[in-house]
Amino acid sequence: MIKITSKLYIHFLTIITAVICIFSHHAAVFAISYGVMLLHEAAHLAAATAIGLRIDRIAFYPYGVNLKLKNRFVHNLADEIILCLAGPLVNCAAALISLSLYNVYRTPYLQLFYVDNTALFIFNMLPVCPLDGGILTKRLLSYFFGGKKAALVMKIISALIAAAMVTLCVYMVYVTEFNFSVLLLT
């Protein structure tokens, strides 16, 4: 990890990815994709700050952006819901706004912004830890059924979703051309 400031870090592979994107004429795709991920994490940061949590660092990885908090423990369910939903809801709102704008200004950049926000919203709402949907689902299950039952249910849900993704990957390899990005998700 390369330390940019006391709270900002960039993985060296992220820089290599950016350089490859620039030289292969995909700089806009890289910028929009990382912009969408940064928007998501900025929403979590705003929510965390609003409920009294402090930031440790923001790190840019080749696969995304990560916000790490100093004091992750959230005392009540309402604050946990706010923290977990902030990022996905901002992505959902950005997707709806960009879709509306795309209906007027048909640019590939607006289309990509819409697709990236929609994909990040859907992916992050999957009930699998450490995704936002998984953290929220586990916290809700813990609230109603206790920690042990919640952990067991989350293991089952995670296994089912992983099996579904592997099945989808096998199906796509069998029926269509090989899609390495789907394989990476599994």
Language-model-derived ranges and their functions:
Residues 1-186:
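Hydrophobic transmembrane alpha-helices and their immediate loop junctions
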